[in-house]
Amino acid sequence: MSSAARSRLTRATRQEMLFLALLLLPVVVAFARAEAEEDGDLQCLCVKTTSQVRPRHITSLEVIKAGPHCPTAQLIATLKNGRKICLDLQALLYKKIIKEHLES
């Protein structure tokens, strides 16, 4: 095989490899994004909690159980003004509210 033929073969091989790499690039990006989104879900929503909210200002409560995303349970209150805040699960007042809610 002549050097010119070898050069054309090498160039064709490089072009094919580049074409394959360009085809695979979106797949790699999609996998990277999916992993980043999954990692983003694995965290506690409640970084800071409060025990200074009066029950009459609360319109709804959401309890998120502890799991792989967060080692502690989380209590999220929606207030009448639409704001969401995290309540301290150890506060006696909120323990009482949860108990009453579960009994009803």
Curated annotation (Swiss-Prot):
SMART domains: SCY. GO terms for cellular component: extracellular space. One of its GO terms (biological process) is cellular response to lipopolysaccharide. Keywords: Cytokine, Disulfide bond, Glycoprotein, Heparin-binding, Proteoglycan, Secreted, Signal. The N-terminal processed forms of platelet factor 4 variant seems to be produced by proteolytic cleavage. The most abundant form is Platelet factor 4 variant(5-74). Residues 1-30 form the signal peptide. Pfam families: IL8. InterPro entries: Chemokine_b/g/d (IPR039809), Chemokine_CXC (IPR001089), Chemokine_CXC_CS (IPR018048), Chemokine_IL8-like_dom (IPR001811), CXC_Chemokine_domain (IPR033899), Interleukin_8-like_sf (IPR036048). PROSITE patterns: SMALL_CYTOKINES_CXC (PS00471). Heparin binds at K95, K96, I97, I98, K99, E100, H101. Disulfide bonds join C44-C70, C46-C86. One of its GO terms (molecular function) is CXCR chemokine receptor binding. It comes from the Eukaryota. It is found in: Secreted. Binding to heparin is much weaker than in the close homolog PF4/CXCL4. Belongs to the intercrine alpha (chemokine CxC) family. Inhibitor of angiogenesis. Inhibitor of endothelial cell chemotaxis (in vitro). Homotetramer. This is Platelet factor 4 variant. The gene is PF4V1.
